[in-house]
Amino acid sequence: PSLKIARGLSTARLREKIAEVQRINQSLAGTRLLCGAEVDIKNDGTLDYPDDLLRRLDLVIGAIHSGFKQGREQITNRIITAMHNPLVHIIAHPTGRLIGEREPYDVDMACVIEAASRTGTALEINAYKDRLDLDDAAAREAGKKGVMLAIGTDSHHLEQLWMMELGVTVARRGWLESRHMLNTLSAEELLAWTQARRQRMQA
């Protein structure tokens, strides 16, 4: 909710969103609408919504949207701290780059990938044309470490969904296969994966 520029939802509005999705699901036959949120990773690695609210979401994506000038150790530990939260499933746009506009922040991607492997946290290949983050080299290293990846378009309009093609291209350039990608799972398989990760981190 602290990220106003991206129309971040207040806790009250997120609760309303969850309730709305539940109402929709009650009216659907044979289809389930999942409810998730991209949640700001604060400077200390904690999340911008309370745990009791995050537990009600099917999918939680952690992302850094501020504090880009933190030192290498601090920003790396910030991401890894978020990974150790059992309620976080995916880390979005892990390097924060905006092509031609902003350099990646000074993060130790080898350490992040290793932590993702240990914690079972997935990493995003953000397919937005100005991000392409992870890039193909980092995506390949993640896949080699057994890390699951998720392609997201960062779309704010239907017309931007075509950028999924760019994300698929990054994954292919990284020699990734369907077995590496959360996108290839059925809804049931995805929910089983999220539950398994949560149980693993709470053990």
What kind of feature is each model-predicted range?
Residues 1-32, 41-203:
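Charged catalytic cores and adjacent phosphate/nucleic-acid-binding surfaces used
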Residues 38:
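Two-metal-ion RNase H-like nuclease active-site motif
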